Amino acid sequence: MIRRKHLHAVWKRKETGEKVADTEILTKGCRAFGISVTDRQTEQFLAYYDLLIEWNKVMNLTAITEFEEVMSKHFVDSCALGKAVALDGKKRLLDVGTGAGFPGIPLKIIYPELEVVLLDSLNKRVKFLNEVIEKLGLTGITAIHGRAEDIAKQKEYRGNFDLVVSRAVANLSSLSEYCLPFVKTGGLFVPYKSGSVDLELSEAEKAIKVLGGEYRDTVRFTLPDTDIDRTLAVIGKVKETPKKYPRKAGMPTKEPIA
């Protein structure tokens, strides 16, 4: 259950002194993407922030811990997917290499009808994700432990998602091999990237095609109230990924398809 102190739109905390952090950073940022944030959703984001900071003291979840920066660089940035693709209706979404839950948990908060699966290779991060899911009262979302190379071979997950997203730091060729096998034919793979992705797209052209994908669009935006340029690459799934992909653990990174 979310603590009642989070019912207020303005949240106070003590660090070197009394500091008031206005959640307008969140609501204004999401509004720039055409997203309205309810009081209940604001409450959930604040509880998420508290858990993130609490767990970050004992494990490495994020280097970004300041309230305003988390609201903008993690929460608002995660929600930008709504700027690139339609998220209405009951779609199944997989977040590969989710880490502390970005973008999957913010997307679930904003789009509660989404069925979300969070995938991470570190079990202790999965324990954190399960704590967040429970404390925020989220349903229709699960966190699983495993490597994408292994989980993508399982019938339950392979080719079963309408949307696959990732904010993981990896070149697009490698990331495509990790993610495209999960996408159903007709679905989308949307990686979050910093700055321009033109060169990455060019270098990943063969990999995307081999894996059954097709480049559709590039959605560029500046994170509201910052000078941070972000890009969402929209890649469609036009045919099934050959069974030999993804290759064994580590290969997509060590020897990207080129």
Predicted regions and their residues:
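Basic Arg/Gly/Lys-rich low-complexity intrinsically disordered segments
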Residues: 1-17, 243-252, 256-258
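Class I SAM-dependent transferase core
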Residues: 2-90, 94, 124-127, 131-141
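Short loop/edge segments at beta-strand edges and connector loops
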Residues: 39, 65, 145-147, 217-219
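Conserved SAM/SAH cofactor-binding pocket of Class I
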Residues: 79-170, 176
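Helix-to-beta-strand junctions that scaffold the AdoMet/dcAdoMet cofactor pocket
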Residues: 111, 183-185
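Short alpha-helix immediately C-terminal to the canonical SAM-binding loop
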Residues: 125-127, 197, 201
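Conserved beta-strand signature within the Rossmann-like core of class I S-adenosyl-L-methionine
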Residues: 186-196
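SAM/dcSAM-binding transferase cores
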Residues: 202-258
